[in-house]
Amino acid sequence: MSSRKSRMDRYSNLHDESYTDVNEFLEKNKKERNIKNKIPKSEIDFSELLESKEEKKVKKAKPNLDEFFESKEEKNLEEKTDNKKSSKDSKTKLNGIFNNSGDKMSNTFIADEEELKSILKDTKKKNKKMKLWQKILVLIICIGLILGSILGFLLYGPNPKFRNWLITTAMTTMNHQYLAKWFYSDKTIDEVLKKNYVKESGEDTDTSKVTFIDYSKTKVMYKNKYEKEILTKDKGNDLFKLININEGSMRGYLVAIYDPSKVKMETAASMGNKGEMLVSIAKRTNSAVAMNASGFIDPNYNSNGGRPYGVVIKDGKIVSNLERANVGGGVIGFTKDNKLILGKMSGDEAIKKGVRDAMEFGPYLIVNGKPSFIKGNGGWGTAPRSAIGQRQDGIVLFLVMDGRDYAHGVDGVGMVELTEILAKYGAYNASNLDGGTSSGLVINGELTNKPVNGSGEKMTRAIPDAWVVSK
């Protein structure tokens, strides 16, 4: 009440007294306040007052670290001099002075220097780990985006080459058709397959065009290097010659068999129940050369390999006659006069035509010297392949091409490449055989080629039968 009354008195004076200006009034009131508070005007320093308030705020916000380290150094010096405390005692008292409304307060903190260092070290390590983890994550995301973009462009881009290759390659396998169905609809797959196919000539082979020639009694004029490779026999081996195929990304083997009467059909020991490995067939039959032949029925994808597609004829008798594969072609066999015959006929019709050994597959690649018309990649993609052919001079050709070895750049071949290789070496009649993991070539009991299955594993599988060259 007293303060309120004094203010009222002061304001009442404003009306009682007369002032020349406002400054005179303010000056008088300042003098009155100074007198009442007994503080000389000259002693009031507002800058110091503001600084004092700022210092209080700082002291409230954090402890005085300078005083902490100074007191710590002094204490350590005293400990070394007096030698009264253990060196293991790393705890020191941290004294900080806090001011609150002009009052001084002192608080003591216990700090462990080693523990603080350890915490800081662990924090730095965690930060580094997080940064490294973040870098790895960013790198993975970037790589994923790049690969995804490339794959998307290949799968759905304007150039259909990769799409056609993937669909035709996958759809001609037994176990990996899902690779095409993952990315494309049935409609797209059908459209691609319709644009990639093999159109056979429709002719049956004219065996009269094949005439055996004994080159040992004839002067030879080589037409090209391929003919020279065929006709130049290995020293001491008049039965066959192994020729390496190494052109671009193509790797494989061609065998020239000089005596076609030695070419025969051999079946797995338990054909009808389970297949047999090619090496086993070759050794069991004492064959100098062996190559896979028929495809096989495999509804459960268990690679049993025991039931061949179509007809199988051995020594002039039908030993198997199951459903045909939807691969074109037809009967592939040798007549009793040792000529390769290709024709769309039944097993009985083949027997009537004098066929001694045969199997069934396709497509036919060359008939009577005329290559089949191949649209696109032929609808078979690229993979390991096997084929059989015969030249006009009677020499038989076994061709086995490796594939799926992408690490070494060996993709395999399609129908186009297979036909070209056979044509270069003079095939007059030729047909595709079962391929993929089944493709195999055994020379003198040893697997010569490098088969790879659809999963990239280096292995072959059991098959129902094989073309062999007896010793």
Task: Please report, for each region that a protein language model flagged, where it lies by residue.
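Short, solvent-exposed aromatic-acidic interface loops
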Residues: 269-274, 347-350, 401-406
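Active-site-adjacent helix-turn-beta-strand microarchitecture at beta-sheet edges
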Residues: 296-378
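Zymogen propeptides
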Residues: 3-7, 15, 22-25, 29, ...
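Structural signal for glycine-centered tight turns and loop->strand junctions in beta-sheet-rich domains
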Residues: 261, 338-340, 394, 437
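Short glycine-rich loop/turn motifs
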Residues: 249-254, 328-329, 382-387, 464
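Conserved, well-ordered active-site substructure
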Residues: 303-323, 372-429, 433, 438-471
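General beta-strand structural signal in soluble alpha/beta enzymes
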Residues: 289-293, 342, 367, 429-433
